[in-house]
Amino acid sequence: MTNLRKTHPLMKIVNSSFIDLPAPSNISSWWNFGSLLGVCLIIQILTGLFLAMHYTSDTMTAFSSVTHICRDVNYGWLIRYLHANGASMFFICLFLHVGRGLYYGSYMYLETWNIGVLLLFAVMATAFMGYVLPWGQMSFWGATVITNLLSAIPYIGSDLVEWIWGGFSVDKATLTRFFAFHFILPFIIAALAGVHLLFLHETGSNNPSGLCSDADKIPFHPYYTIKDILGVLLLILALTSLVLFSPDLLGDPDNYTPANPLNTPPHIKPEWYFLFAYAILWSIPNKLGGVLALVLSILILAVVPFLHTSKQRSMMFRPFSQCLFWILVADLLTLTWIGGQPVEHPFIIIGQLASILYFLLILVIMPITSVFENNLLKW
């Protein structure tokens, strides 16, 4: 008799995705981040659900409802900080996952990659709206500044901003709709992640060498289930350490002050995971140009597969491309640092140079270097 897991309509889907899935025998720990992102999403949905039970999306009570969660609800402080720092862990895993894809040429699976880019946008939108909900100073002013960027769109800009606000400024209507969207988007993200996996399993996983691994496959379970569990344990260790020892390390002190439309904070800045894009935004003096650069800094990922000029898929055997990849990583870290600094000399010029280097590396330098490497190998 055939095993039930191979015949049952529901179990055979799970079986073909997580148990009997043929996987390359040489995938490294860099391939763990997909499962870690799944775990992060589950943590965020569960903690978010419990927070939503006690939160009120009204400008008069939002801030005090968050205070109430931390002070009066059983383990409310733990749920709140798991949710806030869980977002940081989510983005760390996301950036490492995307970095892995760029390094090993995983972007050659076009459908999987493009759904991944869509997922990145969805997660960023969700995180932005979630940051507005506690209704602290940085929540309010962050929402005001970022939504105001849409006014740079010619002709329809100002109408669009008022439509998103639900009035003439960020107010009760804005907070209520942001809460509604923040609640629904994670479920859309989960559905998109399912499609992401569906397309990945159509082609099979890439591997560090970038070569076809059909001749050497191993079952996903037990090899990679055990490997993923180790990754999950390390993730939970990092998250709980952060939550229990320094929960406010990655937050902004200004968000412990209730939102006040009459008092602007000295430095308006988003959470750390948006700082690189924020630095690119204010590196361009023109408003519309800045908004375009901000969107393109993420959207450029969708163009990467078409800029692949190398005869090899992975960077594993391409030392020049490897150097450029790590320069790109250093550049993004520089942009993240600049994004958190005040908008003044010398930070403006450093940000402008780092922004130019970011786009140049991806669009020009890396494709040309790949051609050069092909010629070196007489390909």
UniProtKB/Swiss-Prot annotation:
InterPro entries: Cyt_b/b6_C, Cyt_b/b6_C_sf, Cyt_b/b6_N, Cytb/b6-like_sf, Cytochrome_b, Cytochrome_b_C_euk/bac, Cytochrome_b_N_euk/bac, Di-haem_cyt_TM. It is found in: Mitochondrion inner membrane. Heme 1 (or BL or b562) is low-potential and absorbs at about 562 nm, and heme 2 (or BH or b566) is high-potential and absorbs at about 566 nm. The chain crosses the membrane at residues 33-53, 77-98, 113-133, 178-198, 226-246, 288-308, 320-340, 347-367. This is Cytochrome b. Pfam families: Cytochrom_B_C, Cytochrome_B. It comes from Sorex coronatus (Crowned shrew). Keywords: Electron transport, Heme, Iron, Membrane, Metal-binding, Mitochondrion, Mitochondrion inner membrane, Respiratory chain, Transmembrane, Transmembrane helix, Transport, Ubiquinone. Its cofactor is heme b. Its main location: mitochondrion. Binds 2 heme b groups non-covalently. The keyword Electron transport applies.
